[in-house]
């Protein structure tokens, strides 16, 4: 590798590359979530027949992974660069390798392996065929072909490419700690995120009000159901995300037993499934507007 890109240059390079492949550049969704997959730009758009190509950075919060800003590789919040393409291009893996080249990583000079790792998200009733991408022994990306999202079978097939930006930047810049990553010229990752990491870890493990969180989960669940009764998919899904993050805070705090944990996950999954079904029904009412006219007319005629 020659020039060592800053963190923000890595993002800009990936944005430009996937824009050139026909992806819309979306912005991070403004609700807490544990992974870019949970953004409505992936979760909702991966289901139903309409095409969808999007790329975006998604800050992802995982309270149980917080380490008070002291661990060089474990974080309360990390950043994913998410690419979703539906239908999946036949050359998606080749496109991915080309994106690495633009980041200064020559596939001919490095050990890049696709290691089978089928993906599942029990909280959203989602699963797919997947591979971890290992670069010289370190996982940097998750590749997934969705088979099921929100309990619904997917079709056409959606491919998802999730870059772990901190790991990728650590490799490109040859640093051992994420806090030493250069975010922008003269500004280190740690200068931005060490204090938030410490504070969120302290809150998640020591300070959070368990009673309040338990009450909030119940309230968010009720509100999601109320929104769904009115056919309001997006507000309902916002509350599903709030339920998920609240559960993650409870889990980090040790406030739920193993048995209770399974119950909470099932409750979130049930909500997500209703959201998914309602979304597809609403898109059908609209006539699946993102489909080309010929396919749209044919599909609607078949379904009628």
Curated annotation (Swiss-Prot):
Q: Where in the cell is it found?
A: Cytoplasm
For this protein, the record's InterPro entries field holds:
aa-tRNA-synth_II/BPL/LPL (IPR045864), Gly-tRNA-synth_heterodimer (IPR006194), Gly-tRNA_ligase_asu (IPR002310)
Keywords attached to this Swiss-Prot or TrEMBL record, sorted alphabetically, are: Aminoacyl-tRNA synthetase, ATP-binding, Cytoplasm, Ligase, Nucleotide-binding, Protein biosynthesis
Superkingdom of origin organism: Bacteria
Q: Which E.C. number(s) belong to this protein?
A: 6.1.1.14
Q: Which GO terms describe its cellular component?
A: cytosol
Which SUPFAM superfamilies does the record match to this protein?
Class II aaRS and biotin synthetases
Q: Which PROSITE patterns match?
A: AA_TRNA_LIGASE_II_GLYAB
Is Cell inner membrane found in the keyword set? no
What's a Pfam family in this record? tRNA-synt_2e
Q: Tell me where it mainly resides.
A: cytoplasm
Reactions listed under catalytic activity: tRNA(Gly) + glycine + ATP = glycyl-tRNA(Gly) + AMP + diphosphate
GO molecular function ontology, one term from the record: catalytic activity, acting on a protein
Keyword ATP-binding applies:
yes
How the protein assembles, per its UniProt entry? Answer: Tetramer of two alpha and two beta subunits.
Indicate the family of this protein: Belongs to the class-II aminoacyl-tRNA synthetase family.
Q: What is this protein called?
A: Glycine--tRNA ligase alpha subunit
Organism of derivation: Streptococcus agalactiae serotype V (strain ATCC BAA-611 / 2603 V/R)
* Gene behind the chain: glyQ
């Amino acid at each position: 590798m020659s020039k060592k890109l800053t963190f923000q240059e890595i993002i800009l390079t990936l944005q430009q590359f996937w824009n050139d492949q026909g992806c819309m550049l979306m912005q991070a969704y403004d609700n807490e979530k544990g992974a870019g997959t949970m953004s409505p730009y992936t979760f909702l758009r991966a289901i139903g027949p309409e095409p969808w190509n999007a790329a975006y950075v998604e800050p992802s919060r995982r309270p149980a992974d917080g380490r008070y800003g002291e661990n060089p590789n474990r974080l309360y919040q990390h950043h994913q660069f998410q690419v979703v393409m539906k239908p999946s291009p036949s050359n998606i893996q080749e496109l991915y390798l080309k994106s690495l080249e633009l980041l200064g990583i020559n596939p001919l000079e490095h050990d890049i392996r696709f290691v089978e790792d089928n993906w599942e998200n029990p909280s959203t009733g989602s699963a797919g065929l997947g591979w971890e991408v290992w670069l010289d022994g370190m996982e940097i990306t998750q590749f997934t072909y969705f088979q099921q999202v929100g309990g619904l079978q997917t079709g056409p097939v959606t491919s998802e490419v999730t870059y772990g930006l901190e790991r990728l930047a650590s490799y490109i810049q040859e640093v051992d700690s994420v806090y030493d990553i250069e975010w922008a010229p003269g500004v280190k990752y740690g200068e931005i995120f060490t204090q938030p990491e410490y504070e969120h870890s302290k809150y998640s493990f020591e300070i959070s009000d368990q009673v309040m969180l338990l009450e909030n989960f119940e309230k968010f669940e009720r509100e999601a159901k109320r929104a769904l009764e009115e056919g309001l998919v997006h507000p309902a899904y916002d509350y599903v995300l709030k339920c998920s993050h609240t559960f993650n805070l409870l889990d980090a705090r040790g406030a739920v037993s193993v048995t209770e944990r399974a119950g909470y996950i099932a409750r979130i999954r049930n909500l997500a499934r209703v959201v998914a079904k309602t979304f597809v029904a609403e898109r059908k009412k609209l006539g699946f507007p993102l489909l080309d006219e010929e396919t749209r007319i044919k599909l609607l005629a078949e379904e009628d």
